[in-house]
Amino acid sequence: MEKKPISRQGFDALLRELKDLKENQRPEILKVVQWARSLGDLSENADYSAAKEKQRQIDKRIQFIESVIENAQVIDVDSLSGNRVVFGAKVLTEDEDGNKMECRILSDIESDGRMVISCTSPVGRALIGHCVGDTCTVRLPSGQKELEIIDVKFKD
């Protein structure tokens, strides 16, 4: 499987979440499942059903995080420099109406859709590879938009 970029900070956050899920949340929900099972008839046991559903959600999240970690290409954003937009760059752009937008380009899992955008989003894909002073075209569902790259930085 192709390695997917993720920042060191994002990777470390996933490791912390995985540790919490495995060492705290999953053992706790297993205790609740065991307790609910001890109440008897499982067919009409709402506590048991709810606990099993929560256990499934936790197990699914653990599998997802383990898959992301296994296929991650960790990038130390703080070690990057230059004026070209690459994964990890914080980019200041201006559209044709004079509206400015600053965002950081990171992985899908790290994006929030506003200040941190995915490198696979339409805006992320359009910006990557361009330099300060370049204008690029972003294809959005609402139409095309021209963005001029005003600044690129990597450290806050």
Please place each PLM-identified region on the residue numbering.
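A generic alpha-helix structural signal
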Residues: 15-18, 66, 127
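Internal alpha/beta loop-helix hairpins
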Residues: 46-79, 83
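Non-DNA-binding regulatory cores of transcription-related proteins
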Residues: 75-155
